[in-house]
Design a protein with these regions (language model features):
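Nucleotide-sugar donor phosphate/pyrophosphate-binding loop at the beta->alpha transition
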Residues: 133-147, 184-187
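Short beta-strand/loop segments at the ligand-binding rim of alpha/beta enzyme cores
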Residues: 46-48, 125-134
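Intrinsically disordered, low-structural-confidence terminal and linker regions
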Residues: 1-24
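Active-site charged/polar residues at nucleotide-handling catalytic sites that mediate phosphoryl
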Residues: 85-86, 151
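Nucleotide-sugar donor-binding catalytic core of glycosyltransferases
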Residues: 16-84, 95-98, 103-104, 110-113, ...
Length: 303
């Protein structure tokens, strides 16, 4: 309703004081320069659909879909009690490496996938008549690591249209579909960040957020060199220039930005800070490790 929307607007307005420009101008590798975007509570807003879903997903998918349905984040050892306490209408499993806050670490795809816990759960729920869905967002790069997991499910969806025929061939059925990445309007929207006076904060110039791969994805690396070189060269003529947020800052050397990009690295961001970053820049740069898919692209592009 109008009053509900106004209350939500005022709540966000109070919660989103923007960092001072002089703080932004510093080159501290401090991720707190961006505020956490306040998340509306799915419990307060209510799900858009009257469906209860058992879920294994990463934090981004779990958050986005939590506004669409009632989510039950299942665990490897507690799922039986969970579905007895809260009967589910659907099982939705994403190709998550660290599903449900690491409860399913490498058990869906990866070194342990599909694990015995996952096999037992999917089989038991199918026997109960619960429809089961597997969504592979890691296609095409990790198709071979996911196909055995896909065999367990009633329905399989992929982010890459080019892989549909591969699934039909290897699984022997037609219950295959395309489920691309999507934005969640509750959190991915043009509501502006505010300065301390409550006015829309001035936009910074250009940002890139993600990972540098020194050891793989050469075409992606070539894309990065093109777009980052342009932003680097333009930075001298811009008030703020290029800001880079590195996903693996300070970790393995193969994931660190080399010169001259490293001089633009401003730190790492949590996901709620990333939601603020989306709103903070006039331009957000993106590249993709998938270069020949008709449908696959980074989730961040759509968000």
């Amino acid at each position: 309703s109008g009053l509900t929307g106004l209350r939500e607007h005022l709540r966000r307005r109070r919660a989103t004081a923007w960092a001072r420009p002089r703080q932004w101008a510093s080159k501290r590798r401090d991720r707190t320069l961006l505020p956490d975007w306040p998340l509306p509570s799915p419990q307060e807003t209510g799900p858009r659909h009257d469906v209860t879903v058992g879920v294994i997903a990463d934090e981004f998918t779990a958050l986005a879909l939590g506004y669409e349905w009632r989510s039950v984040p299942l665990t490897p050892t507690g799922w039986r009690e969970q579905v007895e306490q809260t009967p589910i209408d659907l099982l939705f499993v994403e190709s998550a490496w660290h599903g449900n806050d690491d409860a399913w670490r490498f058990q869906v795809i990866g070194s342990q996938g599909p694990s015995g816990h996952l096999r037992d759960m999917v089989t038991a729920l199918r026997d109960r008549g619960v429809p089961t869905v597997f969504w592979n967002k890691e296609d095409p790069a990790h198709y071979d690591e996911s196909i055995e997991t896909a065999r367990l499910f009633d329905w399989v969806f992929t982010t890459d249209e080019a892989m549909v025929e591969h699934y039909r061939r290897d699984l022997g059925h037609d219950r295959i579909g395309i489920l691309p990445f999507a934005a969640q309007p509750a959190i991915h929207n043009p509501i502006r960040l505010l300065d301390e006076a409550g006015r829309p904060a001035p936009l910074r110039d250009v940002a890139f957020a993600g990972t540098y791969f020194a050891h793989k994805y050469p075409e992606r690396r070539e894309q990065m060199e093109i777009v980052l070189a342009g932003a680097h060269d333009a930075s001298a003529r811009l008030p703020h220039g290029l800001d880079i947020f590195s996903r693996y800052l300070g970790g393995d050397d193969t994931y660190q930005f080399p010169p001259p990009w490293d001089s633009h690295v401003r730190g790492s961001l949590t996901y709620t800070q990333m939601l603020s970053a989306y709103r903070a820049y006039a331009v957000f740069l993106n590249v993709s490790s998938v270069v020949d898919s008709p449908s696959m692209l980074p989730r961040r592009v759509i968000e």
